[in-house]
């Protein structure tokens, strides 16, 4: 049983590591990263170390990266697991908060790619306007009167169609 467990764990580890390396490169627009089993030769007892080298920086463990670099690296790892074993839904709670606009753009492009390739639905909690603009549908909670919350939903694809239909160019055509 342990032999089978070790074999499956190593196989999954190698697949996740391969995806992680590729996704890190895409999310950072360069650099390199890998996963390492540490503290034991037995994969069932080993720890995991995340090593990363964002563009222009030396290879170091996750804890030594900046907050934004940590968030993007962790996102690459999460997405690597999803590519290895896709789930139908994933909730991401403000993972874009420490990211600058260029990284938010790459993050959103990666979400779209994963949705298209795995079929996973991502529920993204965010305050970042750029992330909201790249989503298909937005849900918001408002408080019209004290103590009474209401849910607002906007389908951005339909909203774009309405704007295009009402544009002056469309009226002249």
UniProtKB/Swiss-Prot annotation:
Q: Which Pfam families match?
A: SMC_N
Q: Which CDD domains match?
A: ABC_SMC_barmotin
The protein's matches in InterPro entries, at most eight in alphabetical order, are given as:
P-loop_NTPase (IPR027417), RecF/RecN/SMC_N (IPR003395)
- Highest taxon of source: Bacteria
Protein's name according to its UniProt entry:
Uncharacterized protein in ATPase CF(0) subunits 3'region
């Amino acid at each position: 049983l342990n032999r089978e467990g070790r074999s499956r764990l190593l196989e999954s580890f190698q697949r996740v590591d391969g995806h992680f390396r590729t996704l890190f490169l895409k999310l950072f627009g360069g650099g390199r990263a890998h996963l390492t089993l540490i503290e034991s030769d037995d994969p069932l007892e080993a720890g995991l170390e995340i090593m990363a080298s964002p563009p222009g920086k030396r290879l170091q463990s996750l804890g030594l990266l900046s907050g934004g670099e940590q968030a993007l690296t962790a996102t690459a790892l999460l997405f690597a697991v999803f590519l290895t074993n896709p789930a139908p839904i994933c909730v991401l709670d403000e993972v874009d908060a420490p990211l600058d606009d260029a990284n938010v753009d790459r993050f959103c492009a990666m979400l779209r790619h994963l949705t298209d390739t795995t079929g996973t639905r991502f529920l993204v909690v965010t305050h970042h306007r750029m992330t909201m603009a790249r989503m298909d549908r937005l849900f918001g909670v408002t408080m019209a009167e004290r103590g009474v919350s209401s849910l607002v939903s906007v389908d951005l694809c339909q909203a774009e169609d309405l704007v295009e239909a009402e544009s002056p160019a469309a009226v002249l055509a």
